[in-house]
Amino acid sequence: MTRREDGRLDDELRPLVITRGFTEHPAGSVLIEFGHTKVMCTASVTEGVPRWRKGSGLGWLTAEYAMLPSATHTRSDRESVKGRLSGRTQEISRLIGRSLRACIDLAALGENTIAVDCDVLQADGGTRTAAITGAFVALADAVTYLSAAGKLSDPRPLSCAIAAVSVGVVDGRIRVDLPYEEDARAEVDMNVVATDTGTLVEVQGTGEGATFPRSTLDKLLDAALAACDKLFAAQREALKLPYPGVLPEGPPPPKAFGS
């Protein structure tokens, strides 16, 4: 099989590193690295829910995505300076939130909110898929934190794992985990979000300058799901280690009647 410019096979992921406990304060904090792409993903727990959610007894999960000004070769202005979020930033933020809400029982949170923040430290393609994959690990740690604090009505509110990967057709070949150099010239570009039970959460695909047949779509999905299986294995391996911070002490047990 012909190797790519970075030496990988078509179905090979970039070197993947997941570092838990990257920062101290959030309930979940992860640095995820897909090759040269590096994203910090944090999951913070706050009491209360948005106004439209109050009184429902349900929790909420929201997500925000941003790129540091120097994440790419050319520095870009912060969107806070511009006074508005770009359409791309809003789209990716919503994608991350939708993806993570697909795996969690919000009723188990009570009226608490998990806020996920994904900040791209360095970009070389696949930032949204890296953000989703890392954010799930941060979310899992946040759930551990909430469980220790006695704030979960169900101790296992996560129904599945979530991961995402980019796939595409480059030089007429189906390839996974595209770096920027391949993404910029792909004939077909697709992002796939999946669960470890084999189901799909979201598929975003575009023919860049040409159409493509259904058979190519099927092959792209097969390649993406096979790549996601490797990501799930890496997530499980990372989460085998103990919680990387200090867990809160839960509420004391109720007193016996009459004591």
Curated annotation (Swiss-Prot):
Its EC number is 2.7.7.56. Gene3D superfamilies: GHMP Kinase, N-terminal domain. Keywords: Nucleotidyltransferase, RNA-binding, rRNA processing, Transferase, tRNA processing, tRNA-binding. This is Ribonuclease PH. Belongs to the RNase PH family. PANTHER family: EXOSOME COMPLEX COMPONENT, EXOSOME COMPLEX COMPONENT RRP41. Phosphate binds at R88, G126, T127, R128. InterPro entries: ExoRNase_PH_dom1, ExoRNase_PH_dom2, ExoRNase_PH_dom2_sf, PNPase/RNase_PH_dom_sf, Ribosomal_Su5_D2-typ_SF, RNase_PH, RNase_PH_bac-type, RNase_PH_CS. Homohexameric ring arranged as a trimer of dimers. It catalyses: tRNA(n+1) + phosphate = tRNA(n) + a ribonucleoside 5'-diphosphate. GO terms for biological process: rRNA catabolic process; rRNA processing; tRNA processing. Phosphorolytic 3'-5' exoribonuclease that plays an important role in tRNA 3'-end maturation. Removes nucleotide residues following the 3'-CCA terminus of tRNAs; can also add nucleotides to the ends of RNA molecules by using nucleoside diphosphates as substrates, but this may not be physiologically important. Probably plays a role in initiation of 16S rRNA degradation (leading to ribosome degradation) during starvation. It is an enzyme of class 2 (transferase). One of its GO terms (molecular function) is tRNA binding. The keyword tRNA processing applies.
